[in-house]
Amino acid sequence: MKSIILFVLSLLLILEKQAAVMGQKCGSKGQLPSGSSQFPRGQKGQHYSGQKDEQHTKSKGSFSIQHTYHVDINDHDRTQKSQQYDLNAQHKMTKSKQHLGGSQELLNYKQEGRDHDKSKDHFHMIVIHHKGGQAHRGTQNPSQDQGNSPSGKGISSQYSNTEKRLWVHGLTKEQASASGAQKGRTQGGSQSSYVLQTEELVANKQQRETQNSPQNKGHYQNVVEMREEHSSKLQTSLHPAYQDRLQHGPKDIFTTQDELLVYNKNQHQTKNLNQDQEHGQKTHKISYQSSRTEERQLNRGEKSVQKDVSKGGISIQTEEKIHGKSQNQVTIHSQGQEHGHKENKMSYQSSSTEERHLNCGEKGIHKGVSKGSISIQTEEQIHGKSQNQVRIPSQAQEHGHKENKMSYQSSSTEERRLNYGGKSMQKDVSQSSTSFHTEKLVEGKSQIQTPNPNQDQWSVQNAKGKSDQSAGREQDLLSHEQKGRHQQESSEARNIVITEHEVAYDDHLTQQYNEDRNPVST
């Protein structure tokens, strides 16, 4: 035990003598123990206040002596390094001249004589040391940090431009706030530093979203601008917060990029989600329409199709895909309950819109898409689609009946335009009449529609009225209350479809669609 104690005392004496010699010569380069990476304030205060008593210095101030002359060593080494960087050396001199009062407060107001000069160098070198960007390594050899910190080569090539610009542009502003930052750090520790670091990251994200620069180069330029504007806040994060930012900075940067991409990609989804209130059902609509938009751009890259995408139109696709897709849409959405009925309406209108573009790509048909008109199709597609539309929505309940009515009216509209396509038939569409059909189409469709819609009384009446082939009997069935009900419910269904279809793509077309709520003939 005695030998261990003597050995420890001898080491302390040797270290103290070496530190004194190195301090007088203004230091030669050398490595320091691992504890020198941080600067405990309390031990420094004890050391400087107890210099008059030699025993007190040996017992309690030995560890802080290392820190004291660590500052001198850094001063000497960084002075040699700053000879290669004249601009940085000039800023060092101006800093030591401008902040004499702040340097005195840093060492707890207890230095006298030559201690003021050491305190100035100490305060100055702490700022430059952490500006170099090597604090996150827990440095033990100052010579290694000096080779990296002035030139910005230590961390990565991404931070080099930032460090150099901060020394050139933002150093004078950072000097004004450095004394207050060091003073607050001695009392409150590193808590305020981390808080201000968070403000820095938030400010960087906000400015980055404003400028819309998803590249790393633009991000670091924004960092430089934010530091120049808010140097009083950023200076407090030099010692612990800057260390943490160097360790976790790239992660935050890439996270910001991902958020920007999501925001730019789902900009319309964000608007629509803020307006929706019904259990995320309309969210499914928006995502469904986004996938449909990708398919549109994949199939057609023309300018006219792009305009139709912004207006809620669906681009041209092959007949087989449209036929299969309409079956899947009606089958899936018809199984849902109250909230799924609106989805069925919207998806049905989208599929019918695709068929419009498929058969007629003219400008007149594009106008008809926004007004709810149905284009010409082949007889086989009409029969196949009417089968799916009538059979499957009949399984739905109260809300499904309106869907059945709308799909029924739309399919009959397609047959009208198939056979005639004139303006008089469009007027008949708005009046919900089911006359003027050929015998073959009427008979074929009545055979398909009659078996399944028997669950609904209103559908049975429509099926019987259509199978009778006489326009007079159909008008009698749709007259009085049923005719008014048919017109009202079918127009409401179309209005709901058009409105929801419009919200999912572009909120600016609301006025245009509200003016065209009722079916307009082309």
From Swiss-Prot:
Residues 31-40, 137-158, 325-335, 379-397, 427-436, 446-464 have a biased composition (Polar residues). Keywords: Repeat, Secreted, Signal. Residues 1-23 form the signal peptide. GO terms for cellular component: extracellular exosome. Residues 292-310, 336-345, 465-492, 499-522 have a biased composition (Basic and acidic residues). The keyword Secreted applies. It comes from the Eukaryota. The keyword Acetylation does not apply. Residues 26-62, 132-158, 272-358, 379-522 are annotated as: Disordered. GO terms for biological process: coagulation; negative regulation of flagellated sperm motility; sperm capacitation. Its main location: secreted. Belongs to the semenogelin family. Interacts with SERPINA5. Participates in the formation of a gel matrix (sperm coagulum) entrapping the accessory gland secretions and ejaculated spermatozoa. This is Semenogelin-2. It comes from Hylobates klossii (Kloss's gibbon).
